Curated annotation (Swiss-Prot):
Annotated PROSITE patterns: ULP_PROTEASE
Subcellular location: Nucleus, Nuclear pore complex; Nucleus membrane; Cytoplasm
Domain comment (free text): The N-terminus is necessary and sufficient for nuclear envelope targeting.
Protein name (record): Sentrin-specific protease 2
UniProt key word Metal-binding: no
Function: Protease that catalyzes two essential functions in the SUMO pathway. The first is the hydrolysis of an alpha-linked peptide bond at the C-terminal end of the small ubiquitin-like modifier (SUMO) propeptides, SUMO1, SUMO2 and SUMO3 leading to the mature form of the proteins. The second is the deconjugation of SUMO1, SUMO2 and SUMO3 from targeted proteins, by cleaving an epsilon-linked peptide bond between the C-terminal glycine of the mature SUMO and the lysine epsilon-amino group of the target protein. May down-regulate CTNNB1 levels and thereby modulate the Wnt pathway.
Keywords annotated in UniProt: Cytoplasm, Hydrolase, Membrane, mRNA transport, Nuclear pore complex, Nucleus, Phosphoprotein, Protease, Protein transport, Thiol protease, Translocation, Transport, Ubl conjugation, Ubl conjugation pathway, Wnt signaling pathway
Membrane topology: Peripheral membrane protein
Active-site residues from the entry: H478, D495, C548 (nucleophile)
Amino acid sequence: MYRWLVRILGTIFRFCDRSVPPARALLKRRRSDSTLFSTVDTDEIPAKRPRLDCFIHQVKNSLYNAASLFGFPFQLTTKPMVTSACNGTRNVAPSGEVFSNPSSCELTGSGSWNNMLKLGNKSPNGISDYPKIRVTVTRDQPRRVLPSFGFTLNSEGYNRRPGGRRHSKGNPESSLMWKPQEQAVTEMISEESGKGLRRPHRTVEEGVQKEEREKYRKLLERLKESGHGNSVCPVTSNYHSSQRSQMDTLKTKGWGEEQNHGVKTTQFVPKQYRLVETRGPLCSLRSEKRCSKGKITDTEKMVGIRFENESRRGYQLEPDLSEEVSARLRLGSGSNGLLRRKVSIIETKEKNCSGKERDRRTDDLLELTEDMEKEISNALGHGPQDEILSSAFKLRITRGDIQTLKNYHWLNDEVINFYMNLLVERNKKQGYPALHVFSTFFYPKLKSGGYQAVKRWTKGVNLFEQEIILVPIHRKVHWSLVVIDLRKKCLKYLDSMGQKGHRICEILLQYLQDESKTKRNIDLNLLEWTHYSMKPHEIPQQLNGSDCGMFTCKYADYISRDKPITFTQHQMPLFRKKMVWEILHQQLL
């Protein structure tokens, strides 16, 4: 009857005798491993020496075997520990799994329980490359993975966040696996709110050229709708660009002035520049000067569909596309050889055009000598802003006025009025039409004060003996030109932004009627007169927000010679330098 009890007790003592020598041998190897890998993770729990708990563990397993022999239900209240014979580490099984024999690599149980323990392959140094145990259970239970708590150098476990907090990565093979540091960093970046891969930010210059002219056009429309000519509205415009892309930074803020009944009243125009650039001086204009458009990023296009399409897409013109781009240089840079480069596209067209056309293009691309370029650079360089560089026509041009002719700067009244007087002096020569030019302050005063305010402006001048009358128009932040052709009895409004000026032409036509009746006592037949706003496709249009003053001056230059207007936007840098020399020497080239 008690024969089974004797067999069980004998089994207990036999297991205790067998487990002591292997445990000591494995303990030494485990202690060496723990010492070797203690630098990997200081928080890792070292393996303990099997003492009394090993005996208790064997007793419980023996009782379990006895219960299984007689068919009694028996469950362990604690988790049995399995000692791997391969690496000497102990694994704690989940509460739902029971091992019948912990001393071997293959565990077999009674009844329908059939558990198989699979260990990872050993590395040459005796350490398992994959320190995990797979247990396959055949009774409707999913396969479970039993990770080992003893990690090796090439094993995978926790990943650390930048803040020091740990987080584990899910893995169908192992829930505790260390990943290489490089891979962990990559996954961490990619999983945290998608910050791993970002599209690079577009540079400030990219796309500005495409929107430059459109923004300027919308500004003009908004100012036109905001009120009448006497309305006051501040403007602040900030444009950011870089030296390498042939753009500067200019912040314009302030007020302009207009003459009204002998008193200058404030009008919506910038009065002061604040220029930031790597070359050249800091330029600030006088507060009493009314300035045209400010320095804005250049959107000059090349001749041809290819360059025009690139500009529409917002791409910057590459400096190596053609020699024409090199001609768009900075004023004041001191480069002498750039102006003498021939534009390849224009040279090609010159071969196919007539002699008159070729002469006109050659005249526009007149080369400047080194002495001329040196003189221009000195005028645009450092120096007192109030220094007078040219004086004529009862006008004085200072260094600050000349520096408005730098690329991307807005021209002021003094520069435009001085240049218009140079046109009048040239047309006094034989072969040019009789020309009269009004000041830039004429139209604002006429509009605000009527004919009586400007009645004395033509004292000693008979307008009806002239052939062409030019009236520069300044509307808030934009320059345009009205051409009165007395030979054809017509008024034409030229705007580099394509705006219409019917109301301006009507005011000037009424002025001619009053002038004729006062000076000649003759009424004009207004039915014989026409006025017309030039359409954008009929005259060159500016492609940026800074060259409207230059376009106005060149409109006047070509019309005063009775020549068709054939210049383009890309010629503006050359025209600016030529105008500097012409003002300094008080003669046109």
